[in-house]
Amino acid sequence: MSFSRLPLALAFGLITSLGAHADILNKPVSLKTEGDLVQAVSTTLQHAVAMSEQYRGTEPRLQRFARNEINARRKPIEQLNKIGRIQPMPVKQLSVTPTDDAAYLNAMLRNHAWLIELIEFGRSLPLSSNTKRLIDTLSRDATAELAALGKLEQR
């Protein structure tokens, strides 16, 4: 990149980050311990639930997906919060409300891809057997849901 374009690139990056700061998935994450992983995964799941609760679209398949997402994520969030001895964050305040079907679909694709990435990286950490079991289950579920979302995106 030439130095003449540097100010433009910095300004664009600043504008982009200011517009996206409200979404919790844009916050930096440091995964150094099992507790960090548990916190990050719990927050990502809470984000998915908050987005699904706020979704008011018209697509029946996405409505069904949102209901299933809410029901499927409650128990793992509770388990993660118990394992990590953490208090749930007010994620509803930190997620961007989906404005339509496409926005919700994109938000869920992003959320699930981020969840899978967190889990894959987190597997390199020393994990207790309970956490490892829960993380493995979440990984399988998130991968299957990401595939289902991908099919919905193609329609």
Model-flagged regions — what are they?
Residues 3-4, 19-155:
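His/Met- and acidic-residue-enriched segments that coordinate or traffic transition-metal cofactors
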Residues 9-17:
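Bacterial N-terminal signal peptides
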